[in-house]
Amino acid sequence: CGVRPYGWLSRYFHTDHTRRLLIEAGFDYHMDDYSGDVPFWDRTTVPERPLVIVPYQLDNNDMKMWTDPAMGPEQWLAYAKRNFDQVYREGVEGNPKMMSLGLHLRIIGRPGRIWALEEFFRHVRAHNGVWVTTRHEIARHFARVQPA
């Protein structure tokens, strides 16, 4: 039967009412924020029921290979690795961040591109202390370590 959704991404179709509706529906987190790479609390929409915001990073999205002909798997991989290296360095220096990848089977999952994702994960696994997880787990972890 599956699992109910715990988070929500409207892409560009959210309104001023989206977060309130998500809170009323019992969602744990919202992703329609493109402002950074650290989760935070929305304590203003419904002050008595804060909502975790897990930012979405459009620049790491594999959709770039679909919409920008100049962004092939080589360029996507180079960008993703540079992004990871910077975020990792900031974490080692005591300022941990998250990096998200928006991935689509119809794009990165194609035979001519999947190698780039495999190479990216080889690069990530070569670094100590990296947590590869879901956005739901990030939201749950954030709520535990930074209670509202």
Predicted features along the sequence, with ranges:
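C-terminal domain-boundary segment and adjacent tail
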Residues: 29, 81-148
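Active-site-adjacent pocket scaffolds in enzyme catalytic domains
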Residues: 3-95
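A broad detector of the eukaryotic-type serine/threonine protein kinase catalytic domain
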Residues: 2-6, 103-106
